[in-house]
Amino acid sequence: RAIPRAISRAIPRGIPQRATRTVHLALVLLTSLMLGLVLPASASAVTKNGFDLSNSTLDSKDIKRGGPDKDGIFALTYPKVIPAQESPLAGSERVLGVAINNTYRAYTIRYLHIHEVVNDRIEDQHFTVSFCPLCGSGVLFATNINLVDGKTANLNFGVSGLLYNSDLLMYDRNTQSLWSQISAEAISGPMVGTKLPTLPVWHTT
């Protein structure tokens, strides 16, 4: 096989043909290694904690890793509920209060500091209680929502380990989309641009 002209010019005269083939092969391998080093770097520029940020509505440089990996902070799903009169908590305990269909629940800030996200339901209303310890913000979302394929689903949320302006970015396990707690909107993934309905929540004791 003929050696490309650009490469043959770079090879001094008098070198045996076998040696020139070795040089040619070495140049090809070097080029492949260089491409292998470049491609992962460009891909990692739009991926953080395993989330694809290529269609993010936010600048990916402003999305920061909070420390834990994806699901490094364990979100709760359908936690056990106990009556208020059986609760060992003091009356001064800070909680997020939820009222749906004349049913009342209190989610303690103490435990929300640990878990940040609680997926729960009252009758047919599925919802997610979210709390960002850095901002002190508690937001309640209705999670019965239409997906991009037109189907209806109950989104189940987890903690991404990512922050935007020091605020919690959740993700839904249904589509792996990232959601901003403050804007109640998907900022990347298949659900990008979709808004989550919010429900009243009370910061109280």
Task: Enumerate the predicted regions with their spans.
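Intrinsically disordered, flexible peripheral segments
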Residues: A41-T205
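Residue-level detector of alpha-helical hydrophobic segments embedded in or interacting with membranes
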Residues: I7, I11-P12, L35, F74, ...
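Bacterial N-terminal signal peptides
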Residues: A26-V38
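Intrinsically disordered, low-complexity segments enriched in Ser/Pro/Gly/Ala and basic residues
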Residues: I3, I7, T31, A41-A43
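Hydrophobic transmembrane signal anchors and adjacent membrane-proximal interface regions, especially
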Residues: R1, L25, L29, A45, ...
